[in-house]
């Protein structure tokens, strides 16, 4: 294989890598901003592949003597549209009246059509250069699939967590532009263009490359602007991990944590949430010495648990080390959780909660389950019958489990699905709720795998700002406008809770 053919085959590797990268960026961005990762990735992939098919069909109309020139144009267009896609979508989503979904799928379609034209053009160029057809197909497809493999590994493990979606988009746009420049230079004698036209193409390539380089350099600023517009407050911490996007904002004395764009707490009223989550269970298991926290990487549930001097050990299991590190070291956040992670009674385990429960042998008097809302299947499995059965093996016969369970007012089917799932897993349950102004009416469920009775506490042995005998009594009483609907338990094979959650919140949130 001569040098020109080898370089064209190498271009296939880069083209395939970039094409899959834009698909992954669009899917990840849609999941981050719109939720429901299964639906978003499925629809993005379907639209992208359909558009690639259109592009492959359209490529037949490119004249043989214009293949190289059109390939250069394609690479510049793919680099431009693909490179700016993440930044443009981030900024667009922050505009309330913007047609985000329309623009998202329009971009996916345009990029898909352009990418779909690339490989057929390369194959035709190689065929015209006397490459044997059987060798041509095998080499092109081999490097096509190798490029896809490389990006499918690098994107979730390195690129997205270290560079972020916006900078990753610009990086791959630069790769497409580099292929265009290299093709323009190496095959300049075969382009069949005048020096003036070649100069115009080089000028266009330079402009696209300069724009993408500027975007790459300004990626953090662009992300900050878009998230500032989205959240409305000053951003004091913004971290991308392999698992999620963490953003902490501040307005006056109000600190707020967002995970993948969803509010997790406001420092103005989080004490209501965390007192309601933790204190009824710990007051009801008077001799609780060992406590398990699943999730809760902000340390705010820990703060409430550590008020009890009889608690000897707390194990906190949170998937994301970036989360627990942030709330262990950032000054304002450490002050909020009152240095909970520095308490010698606390052990932090950064692991998947389900996998940790399968291997651990520890037993606990109280288990606090404070996972994010079940907005996708990866979180929904942590609200399933098998998970709760696994958890019950680690709770003492007289112990209690408490679970944050979304809103019984805004998401009634989701809330009562958690209750039904716990019952299906063999627990007795005592549902309750509390008003948290930043969330609205929020729900929790106390559950016991062994004990048969529970009475809401009438006094608290630790200082409280929200709970007393009256508020506790009210928490365990449901008004007529929060009835229990008919729901099915959440099992791994149906993930009904994720469906309920999406349907309940549709129309409540954007």
Curated annotation (Swiss-Prot):
Binding site for S-methyl-5'-thioadenosine: 244, 318, 352-353
Positions bound to spermidine: 274, 298
Chief location of this protein within or outside the cell: membrane
Top EC class for this record: transferase
Record field: catalytic activity: S-adenosyl 3-(methylsulfanyl)propylamine + putrescine = S-methyl-5'-thioadenosine + spermidine + H(+)
Pathway: Amine and polyamine biosynthesis; spermidine biosynthesis; spermidine from putrescine: step 1/1
Disulphide linkage map: none
E.C. number(s) listed in UniProt: 2.5.1.16
Catalytic residues identified in the record: 370 (proton acceptor)
Membrane topology qualifier: Multi-pass membrane protein
Domain of life: Bacteria
Pfam families linked to this entry: Spermine_synth (PF01564)
Keywords from the UniProt entry: Cell membrane, Membrane, Plasmid, Polyamine biosynthesis, Spermidine biosynthesis, Transferase, Transmembrane, Transmembrane helix
GO MF terms held by the record: spermidine synthase activity; thermospermine synthase activity
Domain PABS: 205-449
Name of this protein: Polyamine aminopropyltransferase 2
Organism encoding this protein: Ralstonia nicotianae (strain ATCC BAA-1114 / GMI1000) (Ralstonia solanacearum)
């Amino acid at each position: 294989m001569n040098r020109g053919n080898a370089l064209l085959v190498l271009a296939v590797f880069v083209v395939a890598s970039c094409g899959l990268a834009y698909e992954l960026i669009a899917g990840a961005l849609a999941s981050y901003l719109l939720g429901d990762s299964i639906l978003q990735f499925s629809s993005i992939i379907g639209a992208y592949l359909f558009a690639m098919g259109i592009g492959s069909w359209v490529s037949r109309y490119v004249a043989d003597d214009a293949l190289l020139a059109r390939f250069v144009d394609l690479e510049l267009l793919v680099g431009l549209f693909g490179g700016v896609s993440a930044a443009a979508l981030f900024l667009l989503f922050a505009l309330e009246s913007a047609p985000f979904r329309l623009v998202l799928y329009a971009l996916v379609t345009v990029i898909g059509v352009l990418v779909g034209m690339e490989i057929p053009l390369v194959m035709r160029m190689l065929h015209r250069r006397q490459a044997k057809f059987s060798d041509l197909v095998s080499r092109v497809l081999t490097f096509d699939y190798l490029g896809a493999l490389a990006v499918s590994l690098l994107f979730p493990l390195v690129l997205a967590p270290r560079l972020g979606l916006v900078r990753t988009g610009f990086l791959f746009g630069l790769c497409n532009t580099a292929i265009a420049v290299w093709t323009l230079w190496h095959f300049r004698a075969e382009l069949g263009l005048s020096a003036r036209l070649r100069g115009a193409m080089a000028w266009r390539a330079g402009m696209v490359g300069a724009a993408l380089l500027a975007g790459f350099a300004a990626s953090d600023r662009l992300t900050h602007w878009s998230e500032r517009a989205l959240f409305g407050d000053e951003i004091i911490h913004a971290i991308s991990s392999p698992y999620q996007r963490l953003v902490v904002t501040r307005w006056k004395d109000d600190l707020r944590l967002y995970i993948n764009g969803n509010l997790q707490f406001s420092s103005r009223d989080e004490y209501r949430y965390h007192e309601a989550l933790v204190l009824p269970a710990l007051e009801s298991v008077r001799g609780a010495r060992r406590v398990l926290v699943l999730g809760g990487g902000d340390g705010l549930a820990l703060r409430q648990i550590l008020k009890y001097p009889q608690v000897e050990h707390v194990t906190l299991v949170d998937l994301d080390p970036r989360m627990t590190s942030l709330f262990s070291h950032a000054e304002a956040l450490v002050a909020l959780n009152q240095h909970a992670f520095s308490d010698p009674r606390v052990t932090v385990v950064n692991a998947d909660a389900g996998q940790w429960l399968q291997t651990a042998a520890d037993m606990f008097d109280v288990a606090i389950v404070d996972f994010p809302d079940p907005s996708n299947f990866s979180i929904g499995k942590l609200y399933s019958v098998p998970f709760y059965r696994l958890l019950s093996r680690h709770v003492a016969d007289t112990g209690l489990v408490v679970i944050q369970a979304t809103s019984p007012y805004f998401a009634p089917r989701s809330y009562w699905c958690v209750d039904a799932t716990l019952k299906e897993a063999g627990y007795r349950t005592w549902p309750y709720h509390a008003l948290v102004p930043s969330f609205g009416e929020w729900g929790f469920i106390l559950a016991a795998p062994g004990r048969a009775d529970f009475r809401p506490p009438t006094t608290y042995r630790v200082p409280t700002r929200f709970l007393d005998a009256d508020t506790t009594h009210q928490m365990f009483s449901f008004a007529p406008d929060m009835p229990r609907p008919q729901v099915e338990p959440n099992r791994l094979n149906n993930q009904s809770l994720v469906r309920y959650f999406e349907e309940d919140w549709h129309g409540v949130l954007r």
